[in-house]
Each structure stands twice: as C-alpha cells, then as structure tokens.
Amino acid sequence: MDHSIEVTFRVKTQQVIIPEQNIRGNELPLRRWQMELLMLDATGKEVEPTILSKCIYHLHSSFKQPKRRLNSLPFFIKETGWGEFNLKIECFFIGNAGKFSIEHDLTFEDDAYAVDYTVDVPHEFSHLNSELSKYFDLPWKVVSPEEEMSLRIADLPWIKSLALIDEDMMTDVVQMILNDPAVQRAIENHPRREQFFMFITQLPDDLLMKIQAFLKLPNKNSTKQERTNFGSDAIHKDEPVKAHNKLK
C-alpha cells in the first residue's frame, strides 16, 4: 500500500518598482514584492494549505529579519528590496506529522508569476488525514482521532499485559518503539525544548503487531538473544515514504 499522496503547493509572487525614485548611475530600483504559499485541491483549485501548521521563509541574509516564521494562515509575506535571490520555504504539517522544504527563486523578470511544487504527504497521521480528506478523495478510510483511539483501544486488550512484564522485556519493548522509523521521525520533528509524549495507540499498526507477537514469546523458552533478534526487526524493516519536495 502506498504510504503517501501527492499534493501540489503553489508559490505566488508579485513585484512592482516603487515609483518616483531618485536612481543614480547603475543603481537598481527598489521594488515592493509579496509572496504567498497556497495548495491545489483535487480539481486544481487554489486553497489555503490548512494541512500545514506553520511556515518559515528564509530570506537573504541582507534583510534585517531574514527568518520569517508564520504560525497561522495565510502564509504570506511582503517586503521591499532591489535584489533577486533564492530562498528556502520550510513547511510543517499539522499534528507533528513531518515537514518539507521548498527552494524558490525570487526574480523580477515578470510582474507576477506562480511556481508549483509537488510534495509526497504521509498518510499515517489521523489529524493530517482528516484535513486532507477535505480536498482529496483518499485511497484509505478516514476516521477522527477520537474514533481511531476508541477503535484501536477496543482492539488491543493485550496492551494490559505490558503492566505484567519484567524489566528486561519492558526495556526491549521500549527499544523496539524507539527504533521504529515513524517514531523516530515524530521525535525528530518535535520541538527540542518541549517534552515529547506519544500514546501507545498512536504507534504504527505494524509496530503494534510486532510488540504483540513479542509479548507472546514464552519467557522460560525464549533466550535474551531471541528477544534481541526479534526487536531488531524494527531497525531493518523498509523505511516508510517520507515527505519531500519534487521541484519542477
């Protein structure tokens, strides 16, 4: 099963020369320019990128405030300057579901232009799924976070057995969780200065199945090496598709 859906983001740029300037010699004229990040829905219509929680524009270092962090929609900036440059636009998915970057060129060849960028958006996060379903026909079932939590808790009675295992087995279970790529990605994308919490029902299904199978290993018949080998599966399994930008 595919782990992502392709979504197109559009960066729209407009610029104009500021009138009545006293330009001397080879001086370049000052311009006002603005830039906005949008998303295209399934029909190609421009919509606000509500699947993003924040956006950071990394402008040229000559600007007084080159790093522009926008924590809410619209992801729009307005500036004045005379030079063209390449900038990075850092985008963060809602629900700590990852991030991606766009490399965009600010040019003055046209008064207005738009550039599209295609991004693979991961689907293993319920909050992100719910928002995506407003714009796309998803190839998987979408449930609310509350429904997902209720369904998975009801289907995982074996979780109670975690309270009964010994310290060595608990250490192995924790290591399996920390070695999982999806968990590692969630940790990496979480703000470093904030505490990180993850409920067991938020873990990927394949990881939960491995933990369940691991807990069924009879303690008296399974050696430490067997448990170690079982837990290492999380390290060698195929990496999930990650969000990334495909520049056109």
Curated annotation (Swiss-Prot):
<comment type="function">
    <text>Component of the SAS complex, a multiprotein complex that acetylates 'Lys-16' of histone H4 and 'Lys-14' of histone H3. The SAS complex is however unable to acetylate nucleosomal histones. The complex is involved in transcriptional silencing at telomeres and at HML locus. Also involved in rDNA silencing. In the complex, SAS5 is required for maximal histone acetyltransferase (HAT) activity of the complex, suggesting that it may be required to stabilize the complex or help in substrate recognition.</text>
</comment>
<dbReference type="GO" id="GO:0000781">
    <property type="term" value="C:chromosome, telomeric region"/>
</dbReference>
<comment type="subunit">
    <text>Component of the SAS complex, at least composed of SAS2, SAS4 and SAS5. These three proteins constitute the core of the complex, and are sufficient to acetylate histones.</text>
</comment>
<dbReference type="GO" id="GO:0004402">
    <property type="term" value="F:histone acetyltransferase activity"/>
</dbReference>
<dbReference type="GO" id="GO:0005634">
    <property type="term" value="C:nucleus"/>
</dbReference>
<keyword id="KW-0597">Phosphoprotein</keyword>
<feature type="domain" description="YEATS">
    <location>
        <begin position="1"/>
        <end position="139"/>
    </location>
</feature>
<dbReference type="GO" id="GO:0031011">
    <property type="term" value="C:Ino80 complex"/>
</dbReference>
<dbReference type="GO" id="GO:0006357">
    <property type="term" value="P:regulation of transcription by RNA polymerase II"/>
</dbReference>
<dbReference type="GO" id="GO:0005669">
    <property type="term" value="C:transcription factor TFIID complex"/>
</dbReference>
<dbReference type="GO" id="GO:0033255">
    <property type="term" value="C:SAS acetyltransferase complex"/>
</dbReference>
<dbReference type="Pfam" id="PF03366">
    <property type="entry name" value="YEATS"/>
</dbReference>
<keyword id="KW-0805">Transcription regulation</keyword>
<protein>
    <recommendedName>
        <fullName>Something about silencing protein 5</fullName>
    </recommendedName>
</protein>
<feature type="modified residue" description="Phosphoserine">
    <location>
        <position position="144"/>
    </location>
</feature>
<dbReference type="InterPro" id="IPR055129">
    <property type="entry name" value="YEATS_dom"/>
</dbReference>
<dbReference type="GO" id="GO:0005674">
    <property type="term" value="C:transcription factor TFIIF complex"/>
</dbReference>
<dbReference type="GO" id="GO:0000785">
    <property type="term" value="C:chromatin"/>
</dbReference>
<dbReference type="GO" id="GO:0016407">
    <property type="term" value="F:acetyltransferase activity"/>
</dbReference>
<feature type="region of interest" description="Disordered">
    <location>
        <begin position="223"/>
        <end position="248"/>
    </location>
</feature>
<keyword id="KW-0539">Nucleus</keyword>
<dbReference type="InterPro" id="IPR038704">
    <property type="entry name" value="YEAST_sf"/>
</dbReference>
<dbReference type="GO" id="GO:0016514">
    <property type="term" value="C:SWI/SNF complex"/>
</dbReference>
<keyword id="KW-0804">Transcription</keyword>
<dbReference type="GO" id="GO:0031509">
    <property type="term" value="P:subtelomeric heterochromatin formation"/>
</dbReference>
<keyword id="KW-0156">Chromatin regulator</keyword>
<dbReference type="InterPro" id="IPR016665">
    <property type="entry name" value="Sas5/TAF14"/>
</dbReference>
<dbReference type="GO" id="GO:0006338">
    <property type="term" value="P:chromatin remodeling"/>
</dbReference>
<keyword id="KW-0678">Repressor</keyword>
<dbReference type="InterPro" id="IPR005033">
    <property type="entry name" value="YEATS"/>
</dbReference>
<dbReference type="GO" id="GO:0042393">
    <property type="term" value="F:histone binding"/>
</dbReference>
